[in-house]
A protein has these predicted regions:
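Formylglycine-dependent sulfatase
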Residues: 2-316
Length: 316
């Protein structure tokens, strides 16, 4: 395994060299005549560097450790913006988030829809140079990579859940993909699959008691990420002649924490070390967490007043 700490300038210099080495047509300088390389781009939602290859020995991450052992492990990586959609938009387009909308989860909605004739994103660059580009799962912000109205916590006069946002089902990243989709299995739509529980259930935006985790006795394909992995394998088989740019986005470990029981049973909960706080506030019990984050408090548990988290909840 190679530990790699580089500056931002060095990263972009070497990324430019890598694009040229891949030989992607007219945008490559001195492109070699050999067969261009294929690209498998994997993104994982809300994954921290809490992996065995980053020194967390209690973590069971053999496949990621194997991948790290064959490549580079970055120790000095920073997101350009903390918001999920804005960060993905900045990464895929190379644009610095400077406007108000570019700092939000709706950053992709601000991208120009028309075809300008020039690549506006990384996958579009590959597509314009002869690559087949495919997006499976959550690569941009929306699950399945398309624009559709999202459920909210609001209800109308008839008690129906209100949805918001563009609903034209166009790809969030324009002119970038030959195919863009996300498997839904028993769930009604990609957004329901994103927050899916086993047997097709999904998070309720109007029920504060929706569980924050689940460990059902199901195979990998009993949850959306297993279906995404299966679809990605099928795409690899279909695209084997290349060249291709295949982007695969997994939902977990985004809330709710749902996975087949066999993965939960790999861990002895009492043996999981509690996280340290690098800059804890003074005179506050370390087991007390006060925040206004609706992901955990508003949508999954109802706290009427500040309470101490149990050790089990902290390990979760």
């Amino acid at each position: 395994m190679t530990r790699y700490t580089i500056s931002r300038r060095t990263f972009f210099q070497q990324a430019a060299v890598g694009v040229c080495a891949a030989g992607i047509g007219k945008y490559a300088v001195g492109a070699p005549a050999k067969r261009p390389l294929n690209v498998l781009f994997i993104c994982v939602d809300d994954l921290r560097p809490q992996l065995n290859c980053y020194g967390n020995r209690f973590m069971h991450t053999p496949n990621l450790d194997r991948l790290a052992g064959k490549g580079f492990v970055f120790d000095n990586h920073f997101a350009s913006v903390p918001t999920c959609g804005a960060s993905r938009c900045s990464l895929l387009t190379g644009m610095r988030p400077r406007t108000e909308q570019a700092l939000t989860n709706e950053a992709f909605d601000a991208l120009p829809r028309e075809d300008t004739g020039k690549p506006g994103s990384l996958p579009e660059l590959f597509r314009r140079n002869g690559y087949t580009t495919v997006s499976v799962g959550k690569v941009s912000h929306n699950p399945a990579g398309r624009r559709y109205a999202k459920p909210t916590a609001r209800t109308d006069a008839a008690g129906r859940m209100v949805r918001s946002g563009p609903d034209d089902h166009e790809p969030e990243l324009p002119n970038a993909w030959d195919r863009v989709y996300g498997p839904t299995g028993p769930w009604s739509d990609p957004w329901s699959a994103f927050f899916g529980y086993a047997t097709g259930k999904t998070r309720s935006y109007t029920d504060a008691k929706t569980p924050a985790w689940e460990a059902a006795e199901v195979p990998d394909t009993g949850y959306p990420d297993g279906l995404t992995a299966e679809a990605a394998i099928q795409e690899l088989n279909m695209l084997r002649e290349g060249p291709f740019f295949l982007a695969v986005g997994f939902y977990k470990p985004h809330l709710p924490f749902c996975a087949p029981r066999e993965y939960w049973e790999m861990y002895e909960r009492a043996a999981i070390p509690l996280p340290d706080h690098s800059n804890p506030p003074e005179n506050v019990d370390r087991s007390l967490s006060l925040h206004r984050n609706g992901e955990l408090t508003g949508n999954y548990v109802a706290l009427k007043s500040p309470e101490k988290a149990t050790e089990e909840e902290m390990r979760l």
